């Protein structure tokens, strides 16, 4: 079986930022983002290194397991931020199947009182938080018959207390959006290792989070399938061996749709993912390919990869979860069924590998699968890639603004306030507006401020723009 991979720099875009102070970005031509493709026929004249800026030792590719992560003779104590969401419920499935390996210390949720109460009764945590403070009374009432009542703390402070509970060793961060940033900071400062399923933590807060993790000697272990795959592939590589990261994408709900048909997309269409079972927001992100654009930025921060050395390939079967290319042109890949439990389990058990019964964890059979296929992503169908690469190259607060604007746009689309194609327009307009205020090395307060600003601006961006820059479907 031959892997027909993308050549380096297959999908690149000019920045929408003002380039007057930089030689890296040509100025925009009127009418929006202009695409340029490198001439792939020109031979490589130098050895390609994955990054000019070395990542801190906290990055998982060079993480060395310490004694507190090895040889657990008792169940490892875990806290979950976002326990009622897709990541949280799958994490609890793993804990339920492996009670001798893991135990739950803390649970934090947003507003799903019924499910949270059921989780508390089953897993018996020591501390519980519900972010929606108005629901604290309802939660206490639902837990009135519990023999050992956990400590219950409402609001954002409650979520932070769950994240930094002294008994937890690892914190699984499954909250969608920038809401996961402050709990992650609290967990790192309290010395907890992070099982990171919240993309926005690094996309918005990478310049702040990584030095903080380095300072506290904390391991940030990726719990999404693509970055977990990269993490697994690069372990054991010597310094300087990594040449290129290749992120695979299913193509989402519209991978087989003609571009012309996208103007007719309904919410129900976007929520039909062909391979994965996920929450609404990430499923729409898979349809727009914004999830992959955000993952490019996350890979940059996690693995120190330069954007010129991070590529995307459409892989409809979602069996290869991502690949790396080494300096000698070898390609290493991690394969498995599309099951989020596998990368989640690995972040919880790392550096160990836990046996999983094939009754509940089907084993991969390539002979039965038959074939794996690959193709280049379509820039016209997925304008999100251009926006993400541009924001990533800009860095600073621009990546957080991109993420927040997309999150708000997806919310408006699901609520049927905007059309599918307007998701891309909202994000581009918001990023374009932010370019004059972008902060290159933001503080945590600035990251949070511009996250809030982006959501607010995105809400009215289509109305407030007198001459919006067009985004081709």
From Swiss-Prot:
NCBIfam families: Dxr, PRK12464.1. Its main location: plastid. It is found in: Plastid, Chloroplast stroma. The lineage of its organism: Eukaryota, Viridiplantae, Streptophyta, Embryophyta, Tracheophyta. This is 1-deoxy-D-xylulose-5-phosphate reductoisomerase, chloroplastic. It catalyses: 2-C-methyl-D-erythritol 4-phosphate + NADP(+) = 1-deoxy-D-xylulose 5-phosphate + NADPH + H(+). It comes from the Eukaryota. Mainly expressed in leaves, and, to a lower extent, in trichomes, roots, flowers and stems. Pathway: Isoprenoid biosynthesis; isopentenyl diphosphate biosynthesis via DXP pathway; isopentenyl diphosphate from 1-deoxy-D-xylulose 5-phosphate: step 1/6. Enzyme of the plastid non-mevalonate pathway for isoprenoid biosynthesis that catalyzes the NADPH-dependent rearrangement and reduction of 1-deoxy-D-xylulose-5-phosphate (DXP) to 2-C-methyl-D-erythritol 4-phosphate (MEP). Required for chloroplast development. NADPH binds at residues 84-87, 110, 112, 198, 200, 279. The keyword NADP applies. Pfam families: DXP_redisom_C, DXP_reductoisom, DXPR_C. The keyword Transmembrane helix does not apply. 1-deoxy-D-xylulose 5-phosphate binds at residues 199, 225-226, 250, 273, 286, 291-292, 295. One of its GO terms (biological process) is isopentenyl diphosphate biosynthetic process, methylerythritol 4-phosphate pathway involved in terpenoid biosynthetic process. Its cofactor is Mn(2+); Mg(2+). One of its GO terms (molecular function) is manganese ion binding. Residues 1-49 form a transit peptide. Its EC number is 1.1.1.267. Belongs to the DXR family. Keywords: Chloroplast, Isoprene biosynthesis, Manganese, Metal-binding, NADP, Oxidoreductase, Plastid, Transit peptide. It is an enzyme of class 1 (oxidoreductase). GO terms for cellular component: chloroplast stroma. Mn(2+) binds at residues 224, 226, 295. Signal peptide: none annotated.
């Amino acid at each position: 079986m031959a892997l027909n991979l993308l050549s380096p720099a297959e999908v690149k875009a000019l920045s929408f930022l003002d380039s007057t102070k930089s030689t890296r970005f040509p100025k925009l031509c009127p009418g929006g983002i202009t695409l340029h493709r490198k001439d792939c026929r020109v031979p490589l004249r130098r050895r390609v290194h994955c990054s000019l800026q070395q990542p801190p030792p906290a990055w998982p590719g060079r993480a060395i397991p310490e004694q507190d992560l090895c040889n657990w003779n008792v169940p490892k104590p875990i806290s979950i931020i976002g326990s009622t969401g897709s990541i949280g419920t799958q994490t609890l499935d793993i804990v339920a199947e492996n009670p001798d390996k893991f135990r739950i210390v803390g649970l934090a949720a947003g507003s799903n009182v019924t499910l949270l109460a059921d989780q508390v009764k089953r897993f018996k945590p020591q501390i519980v938080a519900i972010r929606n403070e108005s629901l604290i009374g309802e939660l206490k009432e639902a837990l009135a018959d519990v023999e050992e009542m956990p400590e219950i703390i409402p609001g954002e402070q409650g979520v932070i207390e769950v994240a930094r509970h002294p008994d937890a060793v690892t914190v699984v961060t499954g909250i969608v959006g920038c809401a996961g940033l402050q709990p992650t900071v609290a967990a790192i400062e309290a010395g907890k290792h992070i099982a990171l399923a919240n993309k926005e933590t690094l996309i918005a807060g990478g310049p702040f989070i990584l030095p903080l993790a380095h300072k506290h000697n904390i391991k940030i272990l990726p719990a999404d399938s693509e970055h977990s795959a990269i993490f697994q592939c690069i372990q054991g590589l010597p310094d300087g061996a990594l040449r290129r990261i290749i992120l695979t994408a299913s193509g989402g709900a519209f991978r087989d749709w003609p571009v012309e048909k996208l103007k007719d997309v309904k919410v129900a269409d976007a929520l039909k993912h062909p391979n994965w079972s996920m929450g609404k927001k990430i499923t729409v992100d898979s349809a727009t390919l914004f999830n992959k654009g955000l993952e490019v930025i996350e890979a940059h921060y996690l693995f120190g990869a330069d954007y010129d050395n991070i590529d995307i390939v459409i892989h409809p079967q979602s069996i290869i979860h991502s690949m790396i290319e080494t300096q000698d042109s070898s390609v290493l890949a991690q394969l498995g069924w599309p099951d989020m439990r596998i990368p989640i389990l690995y972040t919880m058990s790392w550096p160990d590998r836990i046996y999983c019964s094939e009754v509940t964890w089907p084993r991969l059979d390539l002979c039965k699968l038959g074939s794996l296929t690959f193709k280049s992503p379509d820039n016209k169908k997925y304008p999100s890639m251009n926006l993400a690469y541009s924001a990533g190259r800009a860095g600073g607060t621009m990546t957080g603004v991109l993420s927040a604007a997309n999150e708000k746009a997806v919310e408006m689309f699901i609520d049927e306030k905007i059309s599918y194609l307007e998701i891309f327009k909202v994000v581009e307009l918001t990023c374009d507006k932010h370019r004059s205020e972008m902060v290159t090395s933001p503080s945590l307060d600035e990251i949070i401020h511009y996250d809030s600003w982006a959501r607010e601006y995105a809400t009215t961006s289509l109305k407030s723009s007198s001459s919006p820059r067009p985004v081709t479907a």
